[in-house]
C-alpha cells in the first residue's frame, strides 16, 4: 500500500554544547571463540565559545549489572572542533550472542566536562564473530561449498520477509506490534528476517538483538 504522511514517531531532543557526536562499537571474538575483542571509537564535539576538557568514561555491564570493563580518557577540544577517543579491550570468557542465546551487555558512555556529567548514553552490545569460509564438502564442479559461520559454528538461516505494515495502523508499527511479530517468529523456530525493501525503525533492530534474530537489511 502506498501511503503518505509521517509514518514513524518524531522526536526533539537537546544535548549540551559539549557532548558526544557519534560512536562506533566493534564486538567480536578471538580465534578460540570464547574471548571477546571490544573496540570503541567516540567522537566528542565542542560547540561552546571557548575550548574545554571533555572526559569519556565507558562501562560495560553484564546481565547482572556487574562492570566487566571500564576505562576513561580526557581530551582538550578547541571551540567548534571534534576529537575522537579510542578504546580497545580483550575480555576473557564472554557470553556470546547467537539466535539461540542472545546474550547482551549494556554499554554506558558518560561524557564529563571538567568533572561534571553532561550526558550518559546507553547501548546494547553482543559478542559474535561472523565468517564466510569454505568447508570440506565439494560441489559437482569440484569446488568446495562455502558456508556462513557464527562463532565458529555453521549456520542455516530460516527466516521471513517483513514489511513495515499493519492492517489496523497502516505503516505505523508500534513496539507492541513488533514484539508480537518477533514472538511468533521465535515460536516457529525462525532465526532471521529480511527487511523489504528499506531500513526499519531503530527500535526494530534493538529488538532483533534482544530476541535473537539475524537481520538481512536493505537500503
Where are these regions (language model features)?
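Secreted/periplasmic carbohydrate-active enzymes, especially glycoside hydrolases
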Residues: 1-202, 207, 211-215
Amino acid at each position: 500500500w502506498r501511503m503518505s504522511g509521517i509514518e514513524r514517531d518524531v522526536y526533539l531532543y537537546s544535548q549540551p554544547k559539549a557532548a558526544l557526536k557519534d560512536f562506533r562499537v566493534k564486538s567480536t571474538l578471538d580465534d578460540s571463540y570464547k574471548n571477546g575483542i571490544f573496540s570503541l571509537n567516540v567522537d566528542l564535539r565542542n560547540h561552546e565559545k571557548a575550548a574545554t576538557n571533555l572526559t569519556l568514561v565507558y562501562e560495560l555491564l553484564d546481565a547482572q549489572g556487574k562492570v566487566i570493563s571500564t576505562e576513561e580518557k580526557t581530551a582538550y577540544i578547541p571551540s567548534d572542533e571534534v576529537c575522537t577517543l579510542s578504546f580497545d579491550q580483550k575480555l576473557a570468557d564472554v557470553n556470546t550472542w547467537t539466535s539461540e542465546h542472545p546474550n547482551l551487555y549494556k554499554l554506558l558512555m558518560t561524557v564529563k566536562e571538567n568533572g561534571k556529567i553532561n550526558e550518559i548514553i546507553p547501548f546494547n552490545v553482543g559478542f559474535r564473530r561472523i565468517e564466510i569460509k569454505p568447508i570440506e564438502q565439494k560441489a559437482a564442479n569440484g569446488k568446495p561449498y562455502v558456508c556462513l559461520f557464527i562463532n565458529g559454528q555453521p549456520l542455516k538461516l530460516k527466516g521471513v520477509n517483513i514489511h513495515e505494515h499493519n492492517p489496523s495502523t497502516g505503516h505505523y508499527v508500534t513496539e507492541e506490534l513488533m514484539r508480537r511479530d518477533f514472538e511468533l517468529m521465535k515460536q516457529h523456530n525462525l532465526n532471521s528476517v529480511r527487511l523489504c525493501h528499506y531500513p526499519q525503525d531503530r527500535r526494530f533492530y534493538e529488538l532483533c538483538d534482544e530476541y535473537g534474530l539475524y537481520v538481512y537489511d536493505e537500503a
